[in-house]
From Swiss-Prot:
Catalytic activity: 2-[(2R,5Z)-2-carboxy-4-methylthiazol-5(2H)-ylidene]ethyl phosphate + 4-amino-2-methyl-5-(diphosphooxymethyl)pyrimidine + 2 H(+) = thiamine phosphate + CO2 + diphosphate; 2-(2-carboxy-4-methylthiazol-5-yl)ethyl phosphate + 4-amino-2-methyl-5-(diphosphooxymethyl)pyrimidine + 2 H(+) = thiamine phosphate + CO2 + diphosphate; 4-methyl-5-(2-phosphooxyethyl)-thiazole + 4-amino-2-methyl-5-(diphosphooxymethyl)pyrimidine + H(+) = thiamine phosphate + diphosphate
Entry coiled-coil feature ranges: none
Residues binding 2-[(2R,5Z)-2-carboxy-4-methylthiazol-5(2H)-ylidene]ethyl phosphate: 157-159, 188
Pathway as given in its UniProt record: Cofactor biosynthesis; thiamine diphosphate biosynthesis; thiamine phosphate from 4-amino-2-methyl-5-diphosphomethylpyrimidine and 4-methyl-5-(2-phosphoethyl)-thiazole: step 1/1
Enzyme class of the recorded protein, top EC level: transferase
Family: Belongs to the thiamine-phosphate synthase family.
Binding-site residues for 4-amino-2-methyl-5-(diphosphooxymethyl)pyrimidine, renumbered to this chain: 50-54, 91, 130, 160
Protein name: Thiamine-phosphate synthase
Length: 232
């Protein structure tokens, strides 16, 4: 008899294909509960957690998250994600994504070009892109170096101060173009607004405060995931 082996997780792109609920969180340095929070979020049905500490309470209290500390936080997230089959995303930094062994690198419009980021992280890391208008979404939908894109902000949000909300029209136009790769709506999304978003054609979402500020993050994630799955 051959010894049994633990089931290997699916490659990141295969898990991306079924992902519906994407969470951005800061490192929660002022609370010191990142691993516990991530455990609750993944248990509630979050598929992807991105670490994004810009503008966070921890940054205000302790200063910018340095590379060593970011790698430590990502290691915490990866340990939890591994238990749940979830994905861990790095924001902006291709070098950090490579060093951390992250599943996903997410790039903004002002970050490294996707083709150059791909040279750094290699062929297996999922690369995502933020888009804020129809033209950017259209380009992201056909860029061979991008695996998914986010479009928004649908509604104004304090996590992106100064960025004008794109509204549901951007969601509708993106849905109507029938992209062949996964795309997520982002910006000001919560359980109350989710029906409008689903009606506009989105079936994948990125949230922040809807889970990070919830009294019960696991329950908040479960409610969002249930609504997404019920509509699919």
């Amino acid at each position: 008899m051959h010894p049994s082996h633990p089931k290997r997780p699916l490659p990141p792109r295969d898990r991306l294909a079924t992902a519906r609920l994407y969470l951005c969180t800061d490192a929660r340095r002022e609370k010191g509960d990142l691993a516990k929070f991530a455990e609750a979020a993944f248990a509630g049905g979050v598929d992807i957690i991105q670490l994004r500490d810009k503008g966070s309470p921890g940054e205000a209290k302790f200063g910018p998250l340095e590379a060593k500390a970011e790698l430590g936080a990502l290691a915490e997230l990866k340990a939890v994600a591994r238990r749940h089959g979830g994905l861990v995303a790095v924001n902006d930094r291709a070098d950090i994504a490579l060093a951390a062994g992250a599943d996903v690198l997410h790039l903004g419009q002002g970050d490294l070009p996707p083709w150059y980021a791909r040279r750094i992280v290699g062929p297996d890391v999922v690369i995502g892109r933020s888009t804020h208008n129809r033209a950017q979404a259209g380009l992201a939908a056909i860029d061979e170096h991008i695996d998914y894109f986010c479009t928004g902000p649908v509604w104004s949000t304090p996590t992106k101060p100064g960025r004008q909300a794109a509204g549901l029209d951007l969601v509708r136009s993106t849905a109507d173009s029938h992209p062949t790769r996964p795309w997520f709506a982002i910006g000001g999304i919560d359980l109350e607004r989710l029906p409008e978003l689903l009606a506009a054609g989105a079936d994948r979402i990125v949230v922040v405060r809807a889970i990070t500020e919830a009294r019960d993050p696991e329950a908040a994630a479960r409610a969002l995931k249930s609504a997404l799955l019920a509509a699919s």
